[in-house]
Curated annotation (Swiss-Prot):
Pfam families: Porin_1
Originating species: Salmonella typhi
Signal peptide: 1-21
Taxonomic placement: Bacteria, Pseudomonadati, Pseudomonadota, Gammaproteobacteria, Enterobacterales
Name assigned to this protein: Outer membrane porin C
Gene Ontology biological process: monoatomic ion transmembrane transport
PANTHER family named among the record's database cross-references: OUTER MEMBRANE PORIN C (PTHR34501:SF1), PROTEIN YDDL-RELATED (PTHR34501)
Subcellular locations according to the entry: Cell outer membrane
Topology term for the membrane: Multi-pass membrane protein
A GO term for molecular function: porin activity
């Protein structure tokens, strides 16, 4: 019986962190769920910047209220607290915080810190035990979590076509000190006004296909030609993404390809020790593919390949790195689920990047990393 229960629970746990939430309140059309996890995590690597304790915890809530038979209000908040720092470091941040209204089959609208519509497709490959999703990041235009998202979502195309979902999104300018870190918003985390949309279709028999397009204005800091360390220049940051997914019969296969213009970043621009070079590739080709299998007794092995190839990486002073790999690795890992609340995993990132002038100047790690984690979630 335990084996059968695990085979049903594990796929649900992989959908979202809140899938395993604890119901706190459910009465008179009002519902509140609490969710969270503690990840006792350690990295082993020759890279001193990666090696060591990486323990963290996340906690959040999801709530909804039934206004009437056609209108529902909802909200969600999620927070991350690092457990590998001293008590006075205050190293924590808000991952998401938004509120919205759902109008029956007419769709939903929400505003706040949320996920960009590009992630509607790229999330399909962001399922590795620890690593993954490296070809983009938080506060990276409209590619993942960010501030000031106004999002309209429609499920099953107004209730007329099962599995056909679409979203339209606008993001306001973020150039001030905010975002998902305690160091403020560096130019690599800034964005101008942006908009985009996504379309996904669950074809049936476990197959899904999707695509997304976003375009954002770039800020003055991001186009500051007087900064010799800054690479990449352009009025807009544009992303085109397509993906495929198969999720059935204990098999999970997914792939996504993105082509970006002035949007794929590298290096570090904030803090007291920025990298020698940082900025955005004028063009980048990003590819992620993953394969997993869920055994009935709780084991889920995983293998993946990720690559981000930057094209024409140059600055306003005539310096150029040409075409360079920003991310390139094979990932082999496995997760074992003791039950719906407890799991452990190992994830081996086999780095395929070579040390060269670009990786050294941008501070990009070229060493392998092995991650070991023990997770309690609710």
């Amino acid at each position: 019986m335990k084996v059968k229960v695990l085979s049903l629970l594990v796929p649900a746990l992989l959908v979202a962190g809140a899938a395993n939430a604890a119901e706190i309140y459910n009465k008179d059309g009002n519902k509140l769920d609490l969710f969270g996890k503690v990840d006792g995590l350690h990295y082993f690597s020759d890279d001193k910047g990666s090696d060591g304790d990486q323990t963290y915890m996340r906690i959040g809530f999801k709530g909804e209220t039934q206004v009437n038979d056609q209108l529902t209000g909802y909200g969600q908040w999620e927070y991350q607290i690092q457990g590998n720092q001293t008590e006075g470091s205050n190293d924590s941040w808000t991952r998401v915080a938004f509120a919205g209204l759902k109008f029956a089959d007419a769709g939903s609208f929400d505003y706040g810190r949320n996920y960009g519509v590009t992630y509607d497709v790229t999330s399909w490959t962001d399922v590795l035990p620890e690593f993954g999703g490296d070809t983009y990041g938080a506060d990276n235009f409209m590619q993942q979590r960010g501030n000031g998202y106004a999002t309209y979502r429609n499920t099953d195309f107004f209730g007329l076509v099962d599995g056909l979902d679409f979203a339209l999104q606008y993001q306001g300018k973020n150039g001030s000190v905010s975002g998902e870190n305690t160091n403020g918003r560096s130019l690599l985390n800034q964005n101008g006004d942006g908009y985009g949309g996504s379309l996904t279709y669950a074809i049936g028999e476990g197959f899904s296909v999707g695509g997304a397009i976003t375009t954002s204005k770039r800020t003055a800091d991001q186009n500051n030609t007087a900064n010799a360390r800054l690479y990449g220049n352009g009025d807009r940051a544009t992303v085109y993404t397509g993906g495929l997914k198969y999720d059935a019969n204990n098999i999970y296969l997914a792939a996504q390809y993105s082509q970006t213009y002035n949007a794929t970043r590298f290096g570090t621009s904030n803090g007291s020790n920025p990298s020698t070079s940082y900025g955005f590739a004028n063009k980048a080709q990003n590819f992620e593919v993953v394969a997993q299998y869920q055994f009935d007794f709780g084991l889920r092995p995983s293998v993946a390949y990720l690559q981000s190839k930057g094209k024409d990486i140059s600055n306003g002073y005539g310096a150029s790195y040409g075409d360079q790999d920003i991310v390139k690795y094979v990932d082999v890992g496995a997760t074992y689920y003791f039950n719906k609340n407890m799991s452990t995993y190992v994830d081996y990132k086999i780095n395929l990047l070579d040390k060269n002038d670009f990786t050294r100047d941008a501070g990009i790690n070229t060493d392998d990393i092995v991650a070991l984690g023990l997770v309690y979630q609710f």
